[in-house]
């Protein structure tokens, strides 16, 4: 049984966007294969939200900058005694390859935007009950196609995101691994510290405490207030130990 809960909090806008994209891409595959209306609406709603996120910022530009930054960080470890040089060089090559694929890929999400079925469903998602069979006969008949035909189309849609997914996964993995967890203690449910130009806070809390963190701040400084899940009867201990990584 799980005894700890991991919370992650972005300290800048680019990390906020990346975490949202990661979450939405993960949600795309949760209910596959699509066999009914519920699974279809879950999938198309997440596709629609992904496209909304893509339209708000320069996702490709920010990711390419981060891929370059991670390569420069790894370069500083070349020649350092005790460091696995082959691993460092392999990571650098993987980052270069991910960058090359991303920079040569079509506009992120364009394949999904141009798909007729996705466009039709997106138009109806904001309408309460707007995806009924009489509103979307196209979706209705799509759900009655052979399963293999639907699966193939869904795989094609998801594969169109591969250049983004590959680059984003590498970047987030390296950022998450950039700092170890360290034991910290809050006093009366409050903790604050300097961020040290971090992009991401990762916080491990004991599930027994039934507390959750409210985090505010930016890369230079942040504050954490611990709140009880049970707002009426829950209590916050005077001293609370937790694990924190500033990545």
UniProtKB/Swiss-Prot annotation:
Major subcellular site: cytoplasm
On the tree of life, the source organism's domain of life is Bacteria
UniProt-listed InterPro entries: ZapD, ZapD_C, ZapD_sf
Q: Which UniProt keywords apply?
A: Cell cycle, Cell division, Cytoplasm, Septation
Q: Does the keyword Cytoplasm apply?
A: yes
Name a single GO biological process. division septum assembly
What does the entry list under GO cellular component? Answer: cell division site; cytoplasm
- A Pfam family per the record: ZapD
Q: Which cysteines are joined by disulfide bonds?
A: none
Query: Cellular location of this protein?
Result: Cytoplasm
Matching entries from NCBIfam families are given as: PRK05287.1-1, PRK05287.1-3
The task this protein performs is described as:
Cell division factor that enhances FtsZ-ring assembly. Directly interacts with FtsZ and promotes bundling of FtsZ protofilaments, with a reduction in FtsZ GTPase activity.
Q: How does it assemble?
A: Interacts with FtsZ.
Q: Which family does it belong to?
A: Belongs to the ZapD family.
This chain belongs to which protein, by name? Answer: Cell division protein ZapD
Which organism's genome codes for this protein? Escherichia coli O157:H7
